[in-house]
Design a protein with these regions (language model features):
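An N-terminal-biased, well-structured beta-alpha scaffold segment characteristic
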Residues: 1-91, 215
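Rossmann-like dinucleotide/phosphate-binding beta-alpha-beta segment
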Residues: 22, 134-224
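Conserved beta-strand positions in the Rossmann-like core of class I SAM-dependent methyltransferases
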Residues: 27, 170, 235
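An anion/phosphate-binding loop that grips the pyrophosphate of nucleotide cofactors and donors
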Residues: 43, 62, 196-197, 225
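Short glycine-/small-residue-rich Rossmann-like dinucleotide-binding loops
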Residues: 51, 73, 198, 203-206, ...
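Beta-strand-loop-alpha-helix segment that lines the small-molecule cofactor/substrate pocket
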Residues: 59, 63-67, 78-90, 202, ...
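Phosphate-binding beta-alpha-beta segment of Rossmann-like dinucleotide-binding domains, i.e.
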Residues: 94-145
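Rossmann-like dinucleotide-binding domain for NAD(H)/NADP(H)
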Residues: 225-316
Length: 316
């Protein structure tokens, strides 16, 4: 009996691919490649990462498809409803990058709050003293309030780690979070979170109602020296409103790891602003996290074998 065909559109960990090869015939290629076109009609599985858009147009090319797998957490690039209308299962790896993202957020907090300087040559005593006078953090973390917008897996781990350092953590979420999962963080309304926080870190999901959630009225509630970090989805923040707010507040900082679109273009309103720091979507970029995401192949094999997947896309 021949193996079902699985198209893989992006790089996966070699060990995961080797394992999958025992359960499916693997074809590697982007949706614009000849390899994809040749295999599409009979493909029963499709594995994507961040930038392959799975919509009706792509699904039309895959009439035998049974499962779409996202080697990652967010499902923004997959039209889950369109898949379900066609009886196609959608699976992902919801906890694969939690540790990586939390570590990255911690690094960004340190970047924002604790200036550092490394020397590549000896300095005279006067210059040494001058540097030490200039490179001074304005606060310690145990003096500050960290507001966590979105208290899912990553938000909860951020609360745990930040609380251990000494931040007083508050959070806002649409759901009631069990006290055991709050790690000492206190719930509040979204307006209060922006008004009371020294630092706001955004960890909401990709539901359409979160588009433009952080808008001009919400930004106006922030303190003039606040720090805003976004490692969730670019479309959550209104970039033009953010640029207008930031331009009048030289003491504030914005660190954006995610953007809408990606990559961002020359017209991005925050380009060139001294207190805006734009990163190319790096939060989950550890070899460990990328390998973890690759093991979505286990759920691909489960679906192809007629078994329920461990991590189906959530119902919304």
């Amino acid at each position: 009996m021949s193996l079902p065909t699985c198209i893989v559109t992006a790089a996966l960990d070699d060990a995961a691919l080797d394992w999958l090869a025992g359960h499916a015939r693997i074809v590697r290629g982007s949706p614009t490649s000849a390899e994809f076109a040749a295999a599409a009609a009979g493909a029963q599985a499709l594995i994507v990462r961040t930038y392959t858009i799975v919509n009706d147009a792509l699904l039309d090319q895959l009439p035998a498809l049974r499962v779409v797998a996202r080697a990652g957490v967010g499902l923004d690039n997959i039209d889950v409803a369109a898949c379900r209308r066609r009886g196609v299962e959608v699976v992902h790896t919801p906890d694969a990058n939690t540790q990586a993202v939390v570590e990255y957020v911690l690094c960004l907090l340190c970047d924002a709050l604790r200036p550092r300087l490394f020397l590549d040559r000896p300095l005279a005593k006067d210059a040494w003293d001058d540097v030490r006078e200039e490179v001074v953090g304005a606060w310690q973390m145990d003096e500050l309030v960290l507001g966590i917008l979105g208290m899912g897996r990553i938000g909860q781990r951020v609360a745990q780690v930040a609380g251990a350092i000494g931040f007083h953590c508050i959070y806002h979420d649409l759901l009631e979070i069990p006290e055991s999962a709050r790690h000492g963080a206190e719930p509040c309304g979204i307006e209060q979170l922006f008004a009371d926080s020294d630092v706001v870190t955004v960890h909401v999901d990709g539901r359409s109602s979160n588009r433009g959630l952080v808008d001009a009225p919400l930004l106006e509630r922030l303190r003039d020296d606040a720090v805003l970090i976004n490692t969730s989805r670019g479309f959550v923040i209104d970039d033009r409103a953010l640029a207008a707010w930031l331009g009048n507040r030289p003491g504030a900082q914005v660190i954006l790891d995610v953007h809408d679109p990606e990559p961002f273009t020359h017209g991005h309103p925050l380009i060139g602003m001294a207190n805006a720091h734009l990163a190319p979507h790096l939060a989950s970029r550890t070899l460990t996290a990328m390998a973890n995401m690759s093991w979505v192949v286990k759920d691909v094999a489960a679906v192809l074998g007629g078994a329920p997947p461990r991590f189906p896309a959530p119902l919304r």
